[in-house]
């Protein structure tokens, strides 16, 4: 297992992964930087990784002051482009950078949040997630012939650091809890994590 994060946030990641045994390597990576993406395969080879069995894309960002929280009609293109580049296009650009070192029957898993409806406060992140879901279908079309599986996990709201940056995000909690037939606990990341692990495994060879 190898983990990455933005250079400015990599310290937080290093502290978090210390809970794991063995502790994984942590790379500094800005997926919006073409040069860093181009250098990534060699960085992985230098760590002894010849082939990747799976990739988890858990990357998203929209400026909470300008692109979230009910300011949808006022958001300028510069902020929209950051949200789409980081949250949508990076899924494709990351896999384009890694395609030559993907193992046979590798699995790619990304994270989304139901983009079939408009959510209060979610605004341009909702648009970016809709783009991500469409991008995943195209990624599956183009990587499928290489034996690579591409899927997204659409979990309910979880009490993560990312969620705290969304103004009004707690409003999701009650709505999701009321609608989910099996119920939903925003503090329990296990269901989402198990879904990701299952898709990374070989238990879904044609999914």
Residue ranges, per PLM feature:
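Short, small/polar-rich loop/turn modules that mediate ligand/substrate recognition or access, typified
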Residues: 144, 149, 206-207
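Catalytic loop of short-chain dehydrogenase/reductase
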Residues: 60-100, 104-145, 157-160
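C-terminal substrate-recognition "lid" of short-chain dehydrogenase/reductases
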Residues: 185-207
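Residue-level signal for the nucleotide or nucleotide-sugar donor/cofactor binding architecture
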Residues: 32, 89, 186-190
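Short-chain dehydrogenase/reductase
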Residues: 1-78, 91, 95, 136-137, 164-165, 171-172, ...
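A glycine/serine/threonine-rich, flexible loop-to-helix segment
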Residues: 15, 124, 145, 155-181
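Hydrophobic structural elements of the Rossmann-like NAD(P)H-binding subdomain
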Residues: 56, 109, 150-153, 163
